[in-house]
Regions:
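Hot-dog-fold acyl-thioester-processing enzymes
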Residues: 1-91, 153-159
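HotDog/MaoC-like acyl-thioester-processing domains
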Residues: 2-17, 101-106, 110-159
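Short, charged beta-turn/beta-strand-edge "cap" motif at the junction between a beta-strand
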Residues: 28-30, 96, 113-117
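Short, intrinsically disordered/low-complexity patches at protein termini
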Residues: 46-48, 89, 94-95, 127, ...
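Mid-chain, well-packed structural core segment of small domains
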Residues: 85-90, 95-103
């Protein structure tokens, strides 16, 4: 497993190897404001996200985080290594929320390089990643695949 040193010059298309696993350097603690704000803005009316009184008697014992925030945070944590030289996000697939996330949890992300293919343009290639999110207890909370169009060093890198 390669441990990230945050951003650098080693995330062009040519630098990724199929089968490689990246442990991203940063973690992110989920703040209540982040969860509540986006739940309200998206008109998500599921009480599990905003009714603390109701959720105290639930199997989880407290409010649940909105899955969209979990997905965004995990992909954001991976972006330092997987999108620094991205030209375009091409798609997400097989998104799975594996366990609940609560306010105060801290998320970490790992990524695996699943596939590399040529793009229709000569200055970039397509990399398919599988991202994994875990919480502070190393519990698997998220996984999903992502396709990214990434610059080729041969066209964009230092000469």
């Amino acid at each position: 497993m390669k441990v990230s040193a945050l951003t650098g010059k080693h995330n062009y298309f040519e630098d990724f190897t199929v089968g490689e696993v990246l442990k991203h350097a940063r973690g992110k603690t989920v703040e209540p404001l982040e969860q509540v704000w986006i739940t309200n803005v998206t008109m998500n009316t599921a009480e599990g996200h905003f009714n603390e009184h109701l959720m105290k008697s639930s199997p989880w014992g407290k409010r649940l985080g909105f899955g969209g925030v979990t997905i965004s945070m995990c992909i954001g944590l991976a972006a330092q290594d997987t999108a620094e030289n991205a030209l375009m996000e091409l798609g997400l697939h097989k998104i799975r929320l594996k366990a609940p996330v609560h306010h105060g949890d801290t998320l970490y992300c790992y990524s695996e390089v699943l596939e590399k293919t040529d793009a229709d343009q000569p200055d970039a290639g397509i990399v398919r990643f599988k991202h994994y999110g875990v919480n502070q207890d190393d519990k698997h909370v998220f996984e999903g695949e992502r396709w990214v169009l990434i610059k080729r060093r041969s066209h964009w890198g230092d000469k």
